[in-house]
């Protein structure tokens, strides 16, 4: 009963306005008030500051600086085997497994389609049909930078406007097509494991999504789909990443979805819905290796 009330209220909340206000406050240098907010947040959500490169609260002038805090060097070792992929973020596995034709599991009893997730891009959806997916939820206490599961060449980025529903387990289990209706940034990479997509999904109070190569993607929230394409490998302006390298960040946190083409990787057997993740640990193993190709347009 209480959960139903929470969901109904969430539909009614002015989520855009709340998110704008939260983003404004999170960037304010409000002195003692900022410190009070940071300490209260850390206490309520049991944030482990011992892992932070700057463990003292006083090191953070704004709430956003605290929220996107970096970790101590080498505290998240990245799997080094070239045939293995690394987890992209700290968090909890929401769902993972096979994309059954074009259906992804959101929560028990709830599915959504690849094409809806990819903003109606049928050509792109076909590449990942019958592939694998992993959805990772970043809770408020987690480290909120997102890293690369493997070496990759950036081919395309798509910004998709949308709702700003919370993406916690309660909403995932009760809001249909949650990840396909929320604001998101879709990043397509070419890798030695074939095409890979990494999606950063927005949510209520996520003030912004930033990428390593271009800075802030949202806001502004203009309500239109935007698309960027990037140069080929070896040409001026090409953007590539190494496994474990930071590629984006949330202010405040949300969800990361990874998509892999069929017959390329096998997800690690120890991972299941509810598994705790640490960036850099084992995500998957290669089924076959191939040289990066140029078959994505």
UniProtKB/Swiss-Prot annotation:
Record PTM: Is synthesized initially as an inactive proenzyme. Formation of the active enzyme involves a self-maturation process in which the active site pyruvoyl group is generated from an internal serine residue via an autocatalytic post-translational modification. Two non-identical subunits are generated from the proenzyme in this reaction, and the pyruvate is formed at the N-terminus of the alpha chain, which is derived from the carboxyl end of the proenzyme.
Active site: 90 (charge relay system), 147 (charge relay system), 254 (charge relay system), 254 (schiff-base intermediate with substrate)
Coiled coil: none
CC cofactor note: Binds 1 pyruvoyl group covalently per subunit.
Alphabetical list of InterPro entries matching this protein: PS_Dcarbxylase, PSD-B, PSD_type1_pro
Protein's cellular compartments: Cell membrane
Site positions per UniProt: Cleavage (non-hydrolytic): 253-254
Sorted UniProt keywords: Cell membrane, Decarboxylase, Lipid biosynthesis, Lipid metabolism, Lyase, Membrane, Phospholipid biosynthesis, Phospholipid metabolism, Pyruvate, Zymogen
CC annotations in GO: plasma membrane
Disulfide partners: none
Cofactors required: pyruvate
Highest taxon in the source lineage: Bacteria
UniProt-listed Enzyme Commission number(s): 4.1.1.65
Pyruvic acid (Ser) modified-residue sites: 254
Gene Ontology molecular function: any one: phosphatidylserine decarboxylase activity
Known partners and oligomeric status: Heterodimer of a large membrane-associated beta subunit and a small pyruvoyl-containing alpha subunit.
Role of this protein: Catalyzes the formation of phosphatidylethanolamine (PtdEtn) from phosphatidylserine (PtdSer).
Protein name as it appears in the record: Phosphatidylserine decarboxylase proenzyme
Gene: psd
């Amino acid at each position: 009963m209480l959960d139903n009330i929470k969901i109904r209220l969430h539909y009614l909340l002015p989520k855009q306005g709340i998110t704008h206000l939260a983003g404004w406050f999170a960037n304010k240098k409000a002195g003692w008030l900022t410190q009070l907010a940071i300490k209260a947040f850390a206490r309520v959500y049991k944030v482990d500051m011992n892992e932070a490169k700057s463990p003292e609260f006083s090191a953070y002038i704004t709430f956003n600086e605290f929220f996107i805090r970096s970790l101590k060097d080498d505290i998240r070792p990245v799997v080094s085997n070239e045939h293995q992929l690394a987890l992209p973020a700290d968090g909890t596995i929401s769902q993972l497994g096979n994309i059954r034709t074009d259906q992804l599991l959101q929560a028990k009893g709830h599915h959504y389609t690849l094409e809806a997730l990819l903003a109606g891009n049928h050509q792109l959806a076909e590449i990942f049909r019958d592939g694998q997916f992993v959805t990772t939820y970043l809770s408020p206490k987690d480290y909120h930078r997102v890293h690369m599961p493997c070496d990759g060449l950036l081919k395309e980025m798509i910004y998709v406007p949308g709702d700003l529903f919370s993406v916690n387990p309660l909403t995932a289990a009760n809001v249909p097509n949650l990840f396909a209706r929320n604001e998101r940034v879709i990043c397509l990479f070419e890798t030695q494991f074939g095409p890979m997509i990494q999606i950063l999904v927005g949510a209520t109070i996520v003030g912004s999504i930033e990428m390593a190569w271009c800075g802030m993607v949202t806001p502004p929230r203009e309500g239109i789909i935007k698309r960027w394409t990037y140069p080929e490998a070896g040409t001026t302006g090409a953007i590539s990443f190494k496994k474990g390298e930071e590629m984006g960040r949330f202010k405040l946190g949300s969800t990361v979805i990874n998509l892999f083409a069929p017959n390329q990787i096998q997800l690690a057997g120890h991972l299941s819905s509810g598994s705790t993740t640490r960036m850099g640990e084992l995500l998957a193993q290669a089924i076959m290796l191939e040289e990066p190709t140029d078959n994505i347009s």
